[in-house]
């Protein structure tokens, strides 16, 4: 039985003619079959054409603290492009949505680590270095992908996917002092959150989604809307536009209220957490130094904007609206820092600018209650890219400029983004509380 029979129970969906419903039911099975086959063939083609360097996908360096311990992960890279295998795929043209389950197999991230202890640095200045290898076993991606119509083709835009590994194994390798003996220590956990992988998990998921998008977009764009739907393609375009208008109208209303709340709270500019890093001198000097930054700032939350059209999905139980926001102006820096190494003492300011960022927003309206219950399901930075860091006052320690950028990005990903997400979440929850969301969705 065609799944479209439930659409009569959908509260907010625009009516579809019987002709379009019949056409959707007729073309969907073949579309799904062709898309799965073309997707796998595109994966084989990319694998055959890719050079070795194209299979490595670099990740940003990581800086984080555990108690008094400061840990850096450097030169991180996903060691191969995943072999995406579709376990299931279903298309819902009435909602312009793909439902997918994709097997990515085992993924491996490798890099170097350096561990220091801030307290010991004053009494017993030691540093521990080595290699780290994190393996994500049997990773599965499940969820929905939003489609839009562009000219005579479909394009995929929003990925509401959950990546779940069966196990996560962290392997640390290092050599004993004055010895060629290699030591290996390993731990395994079922959840990413219980391992060091959490520090780069968001960026890794963004990398995986981008790789998936390239492969999927390359094949779905080949499907002709006119050939699939014939005379009914005009009605489908109109319907798709109505879904976009509903989603955008709700998001824009909540966004306007949330931004007003941010401004009224004086939260356009937030305080950034202190930055404290222990570092080694340039070879051959192995003496340690210390850099500490204070009076940090993050701005400007009042520049939150909708990046593009949002996706709208509805079934008999709920409505889901999802897509991406960004901060048009995103600055993060410190008015003052102090650094010391051997006899050199330096100080100045650190100013960072993030030119590209995406914040995934997902709203749900449950229809299982007497009144529609609106909830903020997700607010999460998906990507931060094109980052510029300018450091003043380094003087004789000018060779540290690249390191400072690395530390800034590490602190940004592991501490600053969490602060921003919490503030945005609070503002949207306030907006939802005082807004009649169902009324906005009803024409």
Which residues make up each language-model segment?
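Tubular lipid-binding modules of the TULIP superfamily
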Residues: 2-157, 161-164, 213, 217-375, ...
